[in-house]
């Protein structure tokens, strides 16, 4: 099963991706983890990404796409994967579609974890990070909405919404149900 998880910061995507990965026996692929691993391992893609990050620049989408493509070609992802934090734009969604088509496959589902802005504020402020002020959090939500609304339209035929409010196990059960599990 090949799944994309969408949702605002604090919606619980990472937590649910871990649980789904364990239950379904497929890897969770997070772009943040990919960057850290490739940089730590000193891979050519990691070194290229590090040059941008060290200069304080955003890593170009094309490089992120190459990292994801390299990761989905690993043996443990042959039967599927859960993408957490990718794609972030319609352009990346198109690149992912092309990657999968080149491998004679496609996405099975796109889950959007939905949480109210008030709930997200409560969750994110509860993490205790110094930079999680109301203003910063609201800006991150605004950026997420601006980036993601076009993605929701792009994936409208495959999109399933998951109410991400409630106990972890309740949300997990809803996610599994949305995947037909």
Curated annotation (Swiss-Prot):
Renumbered residue ranges of the record's region NMP: 30-59
This protein's UniProt keywords: ATP-binding, Cytoplasm, Kinase, Nucleotide biosynthesis, Nucleotide-binding, Transferase
GO molecular function: adenylate kinase activity; ATP binding
Residues covered by region (LID): 126-132
Pfam families, alphabetized: ADK
Annotated EC: 2.7.4.3
Cellular component GO terms held in the UniProt record: cytoplasm
GO annotation, biological process: AMP salvage
Residues where AMP binds: 31, 36, 57-59, 85-88, 92, 129, 140
PROSITE patterns, per the entry: ADENYLATE_KINASE (PS00113)
Binding-site positions, ATP: 10-15, 127, 166
Subcellular location: Cytoplasm
Lineage: superkingdom: Bacteria
Catalytic class of the enzyme: transferase
Pathway(s) it belongs to: Purine metabolism; AMP biosynthesis via salvage pathway; AMP from ADP: step 1/1
Keyword match Cell wall biogenesis/degradation: no
Chain's role: Catalyzes the reversible transfer of the terminal phosphate group between ATP and AMP. Plays an important role in cellular energy homeostasis and in adenine nucleotide metabolism.
Complexes and interactors: Monomer.
Domain notes: Consists of three domains, a large central CORE domain and two small peripheral domains, NMPbind and LID, which undergo movements during catalysis. The LID domain closes over the site of phosphoryl transfer upon ATP binding. Assembling and dissambling the active center during each catalytic cycle provides an effective means to prevent ATP hydrolysis.
Annotated protein name in UniProt: Adenylate kinase
Gene giving rise to this polypeptide: adk
């Amino acid at each position: 099963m090949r799944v994309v998880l969408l949702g605002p910061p604090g919606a619980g995507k990472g937590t649910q991706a871990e649980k789904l990965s364990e239950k379904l026996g497929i890897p969770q692929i997070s772009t943040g983890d990919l960057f850290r691993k490739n940089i730590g391992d000193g891979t050519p893609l990691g070194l290229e990404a590090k040059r941008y990050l060290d200069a304080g620049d955003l890593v170009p989408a094309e490089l992120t796409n190459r990292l994801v493509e390299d990761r989905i070609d690993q043996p443990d992802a042959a039967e599927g994967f859960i993408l957490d934090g990718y794609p972030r734009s319609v352009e990346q969604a198109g690149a992912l579609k092309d990657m999968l088509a080149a491998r004679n496959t496609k996405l099975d589902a796109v889950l959007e974890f939905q949480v109210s802005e008030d709930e997200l504020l409560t969750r994110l402020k509860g993490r205790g990070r110094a930079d999680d002020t109301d203003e910063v959090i609201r800006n991150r939500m605004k950026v997420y909405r601006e980036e993601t609304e076009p993605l929701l339209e792009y994936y409208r035929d495959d999109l399933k919404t998951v109410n991400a409010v409630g106990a972890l196990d309740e949300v997990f059960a809803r996610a599994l149900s949305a995947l037909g599990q």
